[in-house]
Regions:
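Extracytoplasmic cysteine-anchoring/structural motifs
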Residues: 1-167
Length: 167
């Protein structure tokens, strides 16, 4: 389960193209200072509200899906919410794989930090937009494809021999 899996969460700042943010009228909102606290992402565009998505891109979106819907409810329709703090951020979860069990279901000690090892993580590629919230589904038992391509090097601790004379 993810609740017992060792991983890392990366936080990235979004650099949103100003011609990709739309209001309910379908106009671009090109001045970032006019963007709301929450931006909603759907089908490679950002919207100022869920209602803007409903009007411009997803006409069959149920009326009970609103700006205040949960992350899980929005995800059912491939919508992501990004909250503005100092900027808009996204998050990527990556589980640290120590030993591969060659199964899509997480195995015991497959993901974890093992003592006397050093782990170096190198981000090679960002394959998509991360989550708008720092969220982990603790009950998820299966591995899933991360939006990041990461190279992991595991180095065992080195033994340093020293001669000692006791007097």
């Amino acid at each position: 389960l993810n609740a017992y899996t060792t991983g890392v969460m990366f936080k990235a700042s979004l650099d949103i193209a100003t011609d990709r943010v739309f209001n309910e009228s379908g106009e671009t909102v090109s001045n970032p200072s006019n963007w709301p606290t929450n931006l909603f992402y759907f089908n490679y565009n950002f919207y100022t509200s869920v209602n803007a998505i409903r009007k411009l891109a997803l006409n069959n979106l149920p009326g009970d899906i609103t700006d205040n819907s949960t992350t899980e409810e929005l995800a059912r329709y491939s919508i992501k919410r990004f909250k503005k703090t100092e900027n808009y951020s996204c998050y990527y979860n990556y589980w640290i794989k120590h030993l591969d069990n060659n199964s899509p279901e997480m195995g015991v000690m497959e993901f974890g930090i093992v003592r006397n090892n050093i782990y170096r993580l190198s981000v090679n590629k960002v394959a998509g937009l991360g989550s708008g919230e720092p969220f982990i589904e603790p009950e998820q038992p299966d591995e899933y494809k991360a939006e990041l391509n990461i190279n992991i090097d595991v180095f065992p601790w080195a033994v340093r021999n020293q001669d000692v004379e006791l007097e």
